[in-house]
Amino acid sequence: MSYVSLDFLKENFSNEKIVFFDIGCCNLWDTKDFVSVLPDATFYAFEPLKDYYEINLERSVEYGVNFFNYAISDVNGEILFYPSEKQGEQEQLQSSSIFKPTIHNVVSYGEPYMVKSVTIESFCEEHNISPDFIHIDVEGAEYNVFMKLGKHRPKGIWVEMIGYRYYQNGRSDRNGIDEVDYELDRLLISYGYEVAFQSDNDSLYIHKDVNLKTIQYE
């Protein structure tokens, strides 16, 4: 479940024809809520997990979302993907990642498989678009994704953080471990972003050249 405020999205982007990227969209559960408050936006949702492919094809038509069974990363081509498995009697799969889980990760994973991967930069060039807002949940791979942002500068970026100790090579941690990795902050700040909100698990970055209202996070 995403904790991005629907009121924040509605106040800043309602009735605007923005381009919204939902990267790591899972089964489009949160995407449908974003669509409900931004009816004039164009949505692009990305999820490489095979288990969600069929349901996402159906839901994307129902919700009016452009769905792509891709991973977004710093690689154009194929990349190894580590799928989670259902935990006990849980109805929904846990988070998956392009990074191999470490011993600190309590989630059970199946056999990794290859998935298609694209960068934000190459996808935008191919489709002649540029995102105005990005919601991203990619289990420690956020830094890799934004390394290939290219010339694109979304007005806002909402990142669902994950402790990088849970995945090999993962970055962007807010879970109070001994050593905190702030490389994602540094990268986005170098692109002109400011940290508007940060919690143990989430961060909101706003580009300094835009004026978005963030009263929900004050």
Regions found by a protein language model. Give the residues of each.
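Phosphate/nucleotide-binding beta-alpha loop and adjacent structural elements of enzyme active sites
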Residues: 1-218
